[in-house]
């Protein structure tokens, strides 16, 4: 199936690993040129052809603008994937989450998307076309005190997606989001990931924590980064030409409500 992405320029944030890296791979596989923004690069990212890697701190007010400026040197941005984000389990409760913790979560997980979108949008508006895909989370609507600041930031991102789609739809620009459940990335399964952090605090092993999480899903397993990336690429493509303002769960059946 031709996704109509050949020779289009895409910007992907949080691109050096996990869902971001998988999305870069998938876009390149569809013939797109990608400007990949991340705080640090990775060998896996650097080895990909058709990728312009930009080292940038997207949690800062000027980082997103610098990323988009670098993309403009390559061409006109037609696709934006706002993927960057981070989560820290707050196992000591709400009162232990400091002002700095809240600001860090909001800056990276929500405001980075706002700022990158704001920087990329003028060129899309001038062209009268474009697609923005925001990587949200099931935690946008599954309230969990263990990730309270992350959940609030993702809820803001999902609301931002819906609201912006209403403004930009008449001007040829689509805005959608995907909401993964647990994904088999370092965010969950790494040495400092969610499973390891919870295991250290509560006892047991990271593997046992991960198995318990997987057991809550109808499929009994974590989603892979490539599966999320495939959904992102579909939404970014011309195959989803009349899809906007929508959020797509990819959670293995974790969410049981209608």
Region roles according to the model:
Residues 9, 16-17:
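Conserved glycine-rich cofactor-binding loop
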Residues 90-94, 98-106, 132, 213:
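Substrate-binding pocket helix/loop in short-chain dehydrogenase/reductase
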Residues 91, 221, 232-233, 244-258:
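Short C-terminal tail/terminal secondary-structure segment
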Residues 117, 153, 161:
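Active-site helix of classical SDR
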Residues 122, 166-167, 241:
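Alpha-helical segment proximal to the catalytic Tyr-Lys
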Residues 137:
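Residue(s) in the substrate-gating loop at a strand-loop-helix junction
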